[in-house]
Amino acid sequence: MKTVCFGEIMLRLSPPGFERFFQSPALQASFGGGEANVAVSLAHFGCDSHYVTLLPANPIGDAALRTLRAEGVKVDHVLRGGSRLGIYFAESGASQRASTVIYDRAHSAVSELAPGAVNWACVIQGAGWFHWTGITPALGSAVAGCVGEAIEAARAAGAAVSVDLNYRRKLWSEAEAQRVMRPLVQGADLVIANEEDLQAVLGVAVSGADVTRGALDASAYREACATVAHEFDVARVAVTLRESHSASDNHWSGVLFERESGAFHQSPRYALRIVDRIGGGDSFAAGLVFELMGGAPPARALGFAVAASALKHSIPGDFNRVSADEVRRLMDGDGSGRVQR
């Protein structure tokens, strides 16, 4: 089935391995971004995955386009223009040293995208699903207007709409995020959040949850998910739960609430030894979209999403380069890491 994702792909610059910034002269270049990561995952799962963005017409934009094509993503509706591609510097943490991300994305091409620039009726035609994240409207009021246009076109075409709230405090305040995001989220088919997004972006508190303790009670999220579902007319609400014991060791799980039935699903819990956690939430979103779009029972879809994301934590870079079959093998208990011959 055809899927469409809209957002900003960025140039990622990282020190080798677990080095500090400029510990050695080299920085490894790759590409990534919340919605692009979802598009890549969906392509690897076998979807007809389309991505919409604005890339500068220079060699860096060309390289980003080649990367998306190489991962199986359709880029027919990518626009060219703008002055620059956003950059982020990512230092991978280890043990008690946290990972660090520094953004250099002001005045990036996507932030200059104005309403009316994209023919959304053409882009969405034939699609079964449209996905966006809260990062894109945080880049500016003009591109936030583009998100609104895309949502309207998706609904008019009968496509499901999902949003990963993805709050970035380096981009905007909670007050500004809530002012912009609350109307955009209204009526979504699926809202995805992490442990803190519901409060920051929608103003919905999670009572009894303390993300600083390193242990989370999944059941504490049921009431908050139900509040989001009913207040914003959302069919399903999913939350990823990261129990961070150190930068290297996390426990990872998720929950899913269904408004119509009131069912609250909890996934299995995975112990992770982290190689790269960037893109973990995006791989969860892609897994959930893929399974729900294919008609999987919600509990099964949640399990697939968490397993897909668990595998992503073992892969350097933003992209989750795993197949649906690999995810299902992990779901079926093949998590030993033994060589596959």
Residue map of PLM features:
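Histidine-anchored nucleotide/phosphate-binding helix
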Residues: 34-44, 147-153
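Conserved phosphate/ATP/ADP-binding segment of small-molecule kinases
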Residues: 171-260
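A short helix->loop->beta-strand "cap" motif at the edges of active sites that frequently abuts
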Residues: 153-160, 232-235
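Conserved N-terminal subdomain of the carbohydrate kinase-like
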Residues: 48-137, 161, 327-341
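Positively charged, low-complexity intrinsically disordered leader regions
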Residues: 1-20
